[in-house]
Amino acid sequence: MPISEKSSATNTRLVVKKLFARQLHEGFGAVVRRSIGRFEFRYFDPFLVLDEFSVSAPAGFPDHPHRGFETVTYMLEGEILHEDCEGHKGVIREGGLQWMTAGKGIVHSEMPSSNSNGITHNKGLQLWINLSSRQKLVEPSYQEIESKDIAETEKDGVRVRVIAGEWNGVKSKICTRTPTMYLDFTLSPGSRISQPIPLHWNAFVYVLQGHGHFGDSKLQHSAAAAHHLLVLGLGGDMLEAWNGSDSGLPLRFILVAGEPIGEPMVQFGPFVMNTQEEIDETIDDFENFRNGFEKARHWKSQAASALGLF
């Protein structure tokens, strides 16, 4: 559900919740920092999970299923090899993006690439975005963009990479089933932004590097450093953020906003549907290789085979 806030004299969104993304173990020896999708912040419609991950071979995320939502993988350092039961295979390299619609079902793996040219740490972000009931069982699909093809612009000490949506007339190539804005900002010391956000969309900031201030510079604002998630309240249509650090370091953060779906949501691990009955059907489909999971029956990723898993 949307998070509301007290009205203010301006249209600037204020920070109503601040969370530190604690480390936890996922997959095969992998460590993630989870902010959305943990017990005290389960769901922020339409966002299900936000993980900042760090993996080094042989750790990773071997063969696992999904149904009913989308995953957005954005690499910050290193590269990840992706394989799925449909025969799709590719590498998400540093600065690159994969926007995967799991739809009615996919089984895939995400592991550090064996061709990482000596890179020992592979870091990135993975965001899960819910789909409406009419889109949950669409055919799986991918949108993949290399770093050089992501829309990017720089002005007045502010660099922006447009992952989804647009900034100052610069538009992303990504088509979003659930309307979403995803911007990667880097602010040099002393610089600031005033970024429009659709009035009724839920929005958050996640800080990747440095120390910044978010909110209304004249009324109320929150300071945050790396690994902090800031939930922005409703009641405004603008984010103000600035790098007031004396350290001389840049401030890097993502701003993500999405239109709430407003439907019932039931999640069981990697399956996200609208009712418990649909979850039970999904588990049955997966275990019996039906209705979207047919090709998973005899499939095992090359990465899992190399590690002797499954």
From Swiss-Prot:
Subcellular locations according to the entry: Nucleus
Entry-linked InterPro entries: Pirin, Pirin_C_dom, Pirin_N_dom, RmlC-like_jellyroll, RmlC_Cupin_sf
Principal subcellular localisation of the protein: nucleus
Keywords: Nucleus
SUPFAM superfamilies: RmlC-like cupins
GO CC annotation terms, alphabetical: nucleus
UniProt record similarity statement: Belongs to the pirin family.
This protein's name: Pirin-like protein At1g50590
